[in-house]
A protein has these predicted regions:
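Glycine-rich, basic loop-to-helix element that forms the pyrophosphate-binding segment
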Residues: 65-82
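Short, well-formed alpha-helical segments that are part of the catalytic scaffolds
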Residues: 11-29
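Catalytic core of nucleotide-sugar-dependent glycosyltransferases
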Residues: 206-215, 220-248, 253, 267-278
């Protein structure tokens, strides 16, 4: 690059080259925008590495991680290579909307720490609109239309995904913020710390980023491993919020306990132990789920050796 770019767009990739091509096609290939694609050890049976997406682009950096460590690790590799004043994150199966580049140009020289943008969501295959990101747009619009401190805090603390926002790189660097290198929910703690350390924010509700949903992606995984990881990230996040006097924004954990018990009592008590380690508030949201949890527990009591499941 002949000059320092304004923006660094970090995109982790794993086994979805066609969707990555779509994502890259939505990004201008210009010197103001540094694109960093980090491949997380994709399979050569799926990806043609001799013609890897982005190879033909002048302002795109390709990194190849030979150990499959997940999107969190991949994003951390991207952060180490980021040269822009601003950070933008994207998933390889998502894409930017045309309004993105005109909108962000308004903030090139702004002093904000975070600029929140509107989000659209569609089915990845047929591009049919879905409601996956409705909650984010709801808190975004509420904070925009009624910018009380409570509404602004709700937006900052509960917008726990890295995309749909522009982040000042110095905020991340100066506070040594990195992504968790877990298989699931690796972006939650990063987004939480970015929110907690930010001082000035801006809201633009114009839809600039499109989130897609497809069968079999990590977001939809409901295995015991996924549940344990997401639960631990949640109670860790709740602990961080308590330490920073935002306990009112803690996420109730009773839902996780109910889902764990639906899998097996063994998984349920694994979550209890994790919660104790992080001093979790087991009673927040408990009333809503008590009857369901007891019902599932009694059902397991009728099985043979439920604790071994």
């Amino acid at each position: 690059m002949t000059k320092q770019p304004l923006y660094s767009i970090i995109i982790p990739h794993y086994n979805s080259p066609t969707l990555l091509i779509r994502c890259l096609a939505s990004i201008p290939d210009c010197e103001d925008i540094q694109v960093i694609v980090i491949d997380d050890n994709s399979s050569s049976d799926i990806v043609d590495f001799s013609h890897f997406p982005g190879t033909e682009r002048k302002y795109t950096t390709l990194l190849f991680n030979k150990n499959n460590k997940g999107a969190g690790h991949a994003r951390n590799l991207g952060l180490a290579q980021a040269q822009g004043k601003w950070l933008i994150f994207a998933d390889a199966d998502d894409y930017f909307l045309p309004a993105m580049w005109e909108i962000i140009a308004q903030y090139n020289n702004s002093t904000y720490d975070i600029i929140y943008l509107g989000i659209n969501s569609v089915d990845s295959d047929i591009l049919r609109p879905i409601s996956r990101c409705q909650y984010i747009n709801d808190v975004l619009n509420t904070a925009k239309n009624n910018p009380t401190q409570e509404n602004l805090d709700t937006l900052r603390i509960r917008h726990i995904v890295p995309w749909g926002k522009i982040i000042r790189k110095s905020l991340v660097q100066n506070n040594h913020i990195l992504f968790e290198e877990t298989k699931y929910s690796n972006d939650v703690i990063f987004s939480t710390y970015v929110a907690l350390f930010s001082n000035t924010i801006c809201i633009n509700t114009t839809q600039c980023y499109c989130v897609t949903s497809r069968q079999g992606n990590l977001t939809s995984a409901t295995t015991a491993e996924a549940l344990r990881t997401r639960f631990e990230v949640t109670v860790k996040r709740n602990q961080i919020l308590r330490q920073h006097n935002y306990k009112q924004h803690q996420i109730p954990i009773a839902t996780y306990l109910y889902l764990a018990l639906c899998i097996s009592p063994k998984v349920f008590f694994q979550l209890i132990c994790i919660g104790i380690h992080y001093h979790a508030n087991f009673f927040k949201g408990w009333q809503r789920w008590t009857r369901k949890i007891i019902g599932v527990f009694l059902k397991h009591q009728k099985t043979t050796n439920p604790w071994q499941q």
